[in-house]
Design a protein with these regions (language model features):
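Class I (Rossmann-like) S-adenosyl-L-methionine-dependent methyltransferase catalytic domain
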Residues: 1-95, 115, 119, 130-210
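A short SAM/SAH-binding and catalytic strip from SAM-dependent methyltransferases
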Residues: 101-115
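Short glycine-dipeptide loop
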Residues: 124-130
């Protein structure tokens, strides 16, 4: 999908998703005391404007689309030296992911599925994971707009993500939810942010015994 079409669609007054995601990411990057942060599915870098360079030792931006990553580098020269963009296909290249203290994954799990996301998190091994998923109150997962047809091919890989199923999938790999926030959108959709923390091994042992 051309980035300009994607961002124009997401920022329409009838959708307002780009603006909402930026505001939510502002709280995500400020929520925890971490030094290495990773944004999976960084796309054009929406929300990176809220990152204070001196707060993080390293910021990883990961995406499958190399042209998106080039745009990120051009848009955020102030993050030069801290920001490292990585072109990685999360379906079959999770072993290339470096370690980080926190992972942010917004509107990503819908396109890679729970199992692939589990593999990525196990590879990165962060203390915190913050996800934003989209819940469709209406019938369509893509809102009507002049740009709707650029999403046609995505329907083949789109998975509907459910809050409780995601929580169960994360618990399987040792992460429990610690925070949930909701943001209503004007198009019969809502964004749900779920934050997870890696459990201490002692806690995991107790769970296994129960």
């Amino acid at each position: 999908i051309p980035l300009i079409d994607y961002e124009n669609h997401m920022s329409l007054d009838s959708i307002m998703q780009l603006q909402a995601m930026s505001e939510m990411m502002k709280t995500q990057v400020a929520a925890y005391s971490v030094s290495r942060i990773m944004v999976l599915g960084v796309a054009g870098g929406n929300g990176l404007e809220h990152i204070q360079k001196d707060k993080f030792e390293r910021i990883y931006g990961v995406d499958i689309n190399s042209s998106y990553l080039q745009t990120v580098i051009q848009r955020y020269p102030e993050l030069d030296g801290s920001l490292k963009c990585l072109c990685i296909n999360l379906i079959d290249e999770t072993d290339k992911l470096p370690k980080a203290d926190m992972v942010i994954a917004n509107l990503l799990i819908e396109y890679i599925g729970y199992m692939c996301f589990q593999k990525a998190i196990q590879q990165v091994n962060p203390k915190y994971v913050s996800c934003i998923i989209q819940i469709n109150i209406g019938d369509n997962w893509v809102s009507d707009s002049p740009y709707i047809h650029v999403f046609d091919d995505l329907e083949q890989v789109h998975h509907q993500v459910e809050e409780h199923t995601l929580e169960d999938a994360m618990l399987e790999i040792g992460y429990h939810s610690i925070k949930t926030l909701e943001h209503m959108l004007p198009n019969e959709k809502k964004l749900v942010q779920i934050d997870f923390e890696r459990q201490h091994p002692i806690c995991l042992n107790r769970l296994e015994k129960v």
